[in-house]
Amino acid sequence: MPALLLLLAVLAAEVKSQEPQAVGRISGLVLDGATGSPLTRVLVLDEGSRVSAVTGADGRFEMEVPSGARRLRASVVGYALAPKEVMVAPGGVVEVTIPLAGGTGGYEESVTVTGGRFRSADPGAPAQQVLGSADIQNLRGVLADDPLRAVQVLPGVATGDDLRSEFSVRGSSFSHMHLGLEGFTTPYLLHAVRAVEDASSSGSIAMINSDVLQDVSLLSGGYVQRSGNRTGASVEFNVRAGSRDRPQLRAAVSGTSASVVAEGPLGPRAARRGSWLVSARQSYLDLLIDRLVEDQVQFGFSDAQVKLQYDVSPSQRADFTVLVGRSRLEEPAEELDVNDLHLGLNASAVGIGKWRWTMPRSVLTAGLLGGVNSFRNETLGGTDLDDGHERQFGVRLDASHQLRPALHVEGGAEVEMFWESRQRQRPTGSTFRLVNDYAGNATRSGTYAAARWSPVASLTLLPGVRFDHWTLTGQSAASPWVQAEWRVGSTSIRGATGVYQQFPHFEHVIGAWGTPDVERERAAHFDLAIEQARGRSARVQVTIYDREERDFLRRPGAETRVVNGRLVRGSTSARYETRLRGYARGVEFFMQRLEANGFSGWFSYAYGRNRYRDTVTNESFWADLDQRHTFNVYGLYRLSPRTSVSGKLRIGSNFPAPGYYTELDGRYYVGTTRNDLRIPSSARLDLRLNRTFTWSTRRLTLFAEVINVLDRENFRYHPPSINGQTFEARRLFEALLPVVPSAGLLFEF
């Protein structure tokens, strides 16, 4: 009898196993989380059954899956993996919508989905660009993995050095730009060799992993001065928050570094009240340079970023962000004299805490910043050439309020304290001479107020004013501005004008090079832009600009030149003086298409002239970063759910060789006219291929990139050696990167 019962049980189980399994259907829509546009050619996978579907032209998909709790995963190249949990009833149909976030960040439900394609960081700024995470990933470069390299391809941005992150906008130098992180001006965001005049062998790279960035914005001129103390463009980084959905891990290997990003919910997962994000990056750039550069300079870096975010209440949020990094440059000992630069060390740390309180009609934000930096440059013999230490502490408070539907006001105040010490010495014969030695501290305080008023639906006015005080010189400054936008159908006309001022730094005021009564630098911006929308996904923009500058700094007598037929060497003791007056004028043309399912990119051309006059000697010359013609082109096309191709092209007429140089019969000599000789024009085309492979909860992305596809020989300025008898300047230009293939990969768990 037991045997008979066992046989009957086995037969019943066999019959049950042959019964059809209950199934249901999932009908869904996949959207771009930023624009709300349907996404075509997206792979949607049911993790349990391995059933998959690909979205059509309308972004929709359908699949038949076993009933019960199902976990879907949407994957397409250029977007973060997106999980979706659904419950499928037997014989039922479930409707789902899956929004995808471009780049590396996960979709946040708090983000408002709109139909607008083009984002704005400052609604009234005539010329601006915002790069999201997806474009940063494609433009940063596999070789360098640097978000500032992504900015270099934006309209109006000029750069002529493959090895440096710094760039110029409308002739303005990097030191005159606002470089911000999470709303604070942050000067320590570069891995670089500091305080070295001979930058021929040096390079730089941003001290932040591109994978942790939410976006980066560029405002070329005429922007709202929430921070102030800069006369040029504004570049702002925003670090994304970690995933509140589940723990995630990303491991990447690029052409120069390896990195890991871990993130996940903070607190109970079901509550979704907070998140954490940790990133670490280690370079092996020195191995690459060893193969590409003849003198085998070694440059390495490491950095880490942390961001914690927590909702204290439904209306209050706290954030804490930390960046730390260090870099090391080592020149080959066999090619150096005992007094030459052999070792350059640089280390920085920045911490930012923020609190945000959102009310029905108002927003209140408070923030704290602390930053430290130290650097040291040593000779082969172990003598310090440069030794510097800097500290920064800041606090700021911002508030905004919607008074009426047509009137919005905002204001804020900040106090920043700085401490800086610097010692510099240079070899003189067999000994060293102290060139500069100072230590000081100062406080900068400022406040601003701004409004946005729309008297009619088609017109918006945005006036504002900022007041600043700098205790180092005892100077105060008032900086007003006004923006206006007029919309007529698909056409927008934006104009802006304002006064932008920058106080002198410690080196300009104290120490051997400083002048105690040096004035602040001032610039008046005048911008006018006309933008024409072409449907929902394209636009054309033309901008004309004029930046009038006065009281800009110069070290007269610091450069070697020919005077009355005699070679006059530059003085190492020359002091800073505010004696330059000049202008930067030009026009920028820009076409952009932003389409999630087709070709995206832009074409831009900028023509500019940047010239100065010394108000004491009446000497007139082109600015160091004057570039007459600038072409920047970028294109991206998604071939399938797994494959995309992109390319970027930068062409520039290039900058002057800074100093008094001239050319005669193919040779270069010290001359009588400053910035009369220019670096040869540059052109560089880079191509990139992305390919993804998806397995359930994991994805592998392979990157392949070729830098300088056309193998064009480009050059940068190199401080030359000068023959005192013939005045010849030898090795004035230095060759940059040839054609370089590179590859990388990214694991996502």
Place the predicted regions along the sequence by residue:
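Periplasmic N-terminal accessory/gating domains of Gram-negative outer-membrane beta-barrel systems
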Residues: A80, M87-E95, E109-V224, S234-A241, ...
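Periplasm-facing N-terminal accessory domains of Gram-negative outer-membrane beta-barrel systems
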Residues: V10-G116, A121-D122, W453, W486
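Surface-exposed extracellular loop regions of Gram-negative outer-membrane beta-barrel proteins
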Residues: T185, L190, V196, S421-T428, ...
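Outer membrane beta-barrel strand-and-loop segments of large Gram-negative receptors
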Residues: Q392-D398, N436-Y448, E519, H525, ...
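Gram-negative outer-membrane beta-barrel transporters
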Residues: V456-L461, D546-E548, G570-Y661
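C-terminal beta-signal and adjacent terminal beta-strands/loops
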Residues: R642, I651-D665, N690-F749
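Transmembrane beta-barrel wall of Gram-negative outer-membrane proteins
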Residues: S254-Q282, E294-R328, H342-T365, H401-L407, ...
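Structural signature of Gram-negative outer-membrane beta-barrels, strongest in the C-terminal barrel
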Residues: T321-L323, S400-E410, E414, V435-R550, ...
